[in-house]
């Protein structure tokens, strides 16, 4: 962080992108300013945004690879230049773009001799490769080579303990961090009591999203963190009132669906195959469910009202939105018999 004195004017608080460029397929750069801020505010915003950008943005990555009959990750495979460990490291570097939730399967199946690159990965429709030229392995002999892959969307850095995987399946330390780096600097302007600050924010991403998209998502995540306090103020309840308040259940999926075998929706599609991103929920409700690892309609129906009300930022109006959505996917007559508001 750098502080400098510059001349400037005090206008209504606003932000804008002052520089944007694409250095390569896997390196995007953006520079933004927010001004004017009172003394100390630039630090508050800069620190919060930097942490949110580096740790709260979701990314898609390869989380597991399965080789046939490979005793350990340091093994070598006849006809392949790289060891299994080197192949795993190359797979870890593959940059993917998607809106998927949960785990999806992918694969590589080629015949040598040839170079294997990211474009050889057979992906589900919802996933795309940012840079198809990323190397994976070099087949030096005419052999058939197949790998089964698992792809997931997550945030941060996920590690898994290595075990003796007899089936040739190996976890990859997944790096779901589309933002590579964030810097911010603060510039002071004005004199005396008219002194203000300008926040400069620099963002580098891996190409799976633009710096502007990353900044928007980080800002939304920060806003969601403070929504409970805003709602408490709007409702006008004191701490003691809120502590002792009982929330009547507006909906009870698990209890009221007891003894009801709802494994499929009205169209006969299994509920575990209907993902919440297909339900057209409001973004706030959708984000609440996503953060609680509720990815499918079956996940949603397995929750009680107590489970849902414990989700951060989840409110009564979210329950009403979910009810409206359920009417589209479940038998209405059965729902009316089991669920009431």
Curated annotation (Swiss-Prot):
Its main location: plastid. GO terms for molecular function: DNA binding; DNA-directed RNA polymerase activity; protein dimerization activity. Residues 1-233 are annotated as: Alpha N-terminal domain (alpha-NTD). It is an enzyme of class 2 (transferase). Its EC number is 2.7.7.6. It catalyses: RNA(n) + a ribonucleoside 5'-triphosphate = RNA(n+1) + diphosphate. InterPro entries: DNA-dir_RNA_pol_insert, DNA-dir_RNA_pol_RpoA/D/Rpb3, DNA-dir_RpoA, RBP11-like, RNAP_asu_C, RNApol_insert_sf. Disulfide bonds: none annotated. It is found in: Plastid, Chloroplast. Coiled coil: none annotated. GO terms for biological process: DNA-templated transcription. Residues 269-341 are annotated as: Alpha C-terminal domain (alpha-CTD). The keyword Ion transport does not apply. Keywords: Chloroplast, DNA-directed RNA polymerase, Nucleotidyltransferase, Plastid, Transcription, Transferase. It comes from the Eukaryota. NCBIfam families: rpoA. Belongs to the RNA polymerase alpha chain family. The N-terminal domain is essential for RNAP assembly and basal transcription, whereas the C-terminal domain is involved in interaction with transcriptional regulators and with upstream promoter elements. In plastids the minimal PEP RNA polymerase catalytic core is composed of four subunits: alpha, beta, beta', and beta''. When a (nuclear-encoded) sigma factor is associated with the core the holoenzyme is formed, which can initiate transcription. DNA-dependent RNA polymerase catalyzes the transcription of DNA into RNA using the four ribonucleoside triphosphates as substrates. This is DNA-directed RNA polymerase subunit alpha.
């Amino acid at each position: 962080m750098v502080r400098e004195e510059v001349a400037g004017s005090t206008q209504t608080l606003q932000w804008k992108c002052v520089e944007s460029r694409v250095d390569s397929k896997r390196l995007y750069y953006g520079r933004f300013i927010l001004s004017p801020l009172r003394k100390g505010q630039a630090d508050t915003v800069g620190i919060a945004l930097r942490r949110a950008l580096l740790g709260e943005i979701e990314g898609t990555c390869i989380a597991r690879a399965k080789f046939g009959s490979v005793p350990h990750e340091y093994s070598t495979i006849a006809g392949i230049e790289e060891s299994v460990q080197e192949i795993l490291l190359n797979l870890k570097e593959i940059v993917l773009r998607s809106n998927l939730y949960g785990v999806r399967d992918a694969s590589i199946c080629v015949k040598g001799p040839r170079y294997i690159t990211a474009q050889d990965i057979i992906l589900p429709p919802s996933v795309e490769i940012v840079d198809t030229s990323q190397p994976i392995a070099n087949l030096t002999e005419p052999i058939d080579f197949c790998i089964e892959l698992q792809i997931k969307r997550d945030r941060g850095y996920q590690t898994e303990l290595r075990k003796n995987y007899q089936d040739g399946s190996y976890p990859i330390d997944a790096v779901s961090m589309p933002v590579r780096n964030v810097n911010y600097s603060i510039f002071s302007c004005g004199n005396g009591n008219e002194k203000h600050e300008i926040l400069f924010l620099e963002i580098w991403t891996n190409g799976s999203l633009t710096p502007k998209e990353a900044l928007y998502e980080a800002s939304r995540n920060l806003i969601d963190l403070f929504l409970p306090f805003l709602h408490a103020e709007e409702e006008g309840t004191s701490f003691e009132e809120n502590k002792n308040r009982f929330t009547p259940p507006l909906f009870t999926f698990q209890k009221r669906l007891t003894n009801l075998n709802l494994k499929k929706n009205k169209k006969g599609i299994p509920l575990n195959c209907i993902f919440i991103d297909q339900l057209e929920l409001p973004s706030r409700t959708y984000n609440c469910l996503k953060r609680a690892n509720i990815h499918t309609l079956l996940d949603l129906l397995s929750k009680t009202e107590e489970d849902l009300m414990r989700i951060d930022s989840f409110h009564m109006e979210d329950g009403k939105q979910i009810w409206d959505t359920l009417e589209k996917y479940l038998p209405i007559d059965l729902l009316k018999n089991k669920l009431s508001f």
